[in-house]
Amino acid sequence: MRSARSTALNRGEQRAVRYYSHMKLNMAEEEDYMSDSFINVQEDIRPGLPMLRQIREARRKEEKQQEANLKNRQKSLKEEEQERRDIGLKNALGCENKGFALLQKMGYKSGQALGKSGGGIVEPIPLNIKTGKSGIGHEASLKRKAEEKLESYRKKIHMKNQAEEKAAEQFRMRLKNKQDEMKLEGDLRRSQRACQQLDVQKNIQVPREAWYWLRLEEETEEDEEEKEQDEDEYKSEDLSVLEKLQILTSYLREEHLYCIWCGTAYEDKEDLSSNCPGPTSADHD
């Protein structure tokens, strides 16, 4: 009886132990942010800072080592030949050179120009060693084409500038001609107005020519037919504004002793010729 009871008790204890162990395992799998283990992990951040400094220091040493290796790198045969050639070209020939000694015997002096007149070159012709894979004359051809292209571009720019200057000059001439034409028309209207006033003062009721007087902008219906006839006569006149101004100016000076640019009616011809600069607008500038 006792053995059976103890056996059952042992089995119950074993089940309890297994259940308790299982519960502890489940609790361990869940994160406890208030546990010491989690706090210790957070506090382990500080030891990482020295590690970063060590990494940076290692990288700095590696870079210095690479620079030192680059400086101490053995030069290639091509680089050594280039250096020796440059040094040799920079140094002048000495008396130990047979060719130079022969030139000295012939009267040549160091630093003297070649040629009988002494107008030749002083420095030797530089060596241009070809290093590319292109054919002979290819680089010169490319250079010539580039120069031709540049020259063509310059010519186009020059022609464009000339065309722009010509267009600007033509515009200025047209503007000047327009201004001159407007000035002539203004002088002609002033002459017509003065001619009409002076003719009326002398009881001249009809102008010598229809265009000697200004035309009225508003006329009565009774004068419509006469206006049309006058317009036909006016249009038949084949005279420019300048020609009309010259004719009317001459009429005013001879008939009324008047100059529109002076704005004065003179006493006689002698007074007119003595005090008036001339019969044109340019004479009064």
UniProtKB/Swiss-Prot annotation:
Residues 51-87 form a coiled coil. The modification N6-acetyllysine is found at residue 149. Residues 218-235 have a biased composition (Acidic residues). PROSITE patterns: G_PATCH. This is G patch domain-containing protein 11. Residues 59-84, 218-237 are annotated as: Disordered. Its main location: nucleus. Keywords: Acetylation, Centromere, Chromosome, Coiled coil, Kinetochore, Phosphoprotein. Belongs to the GPATCH11 family. The gene is GPATCH11.
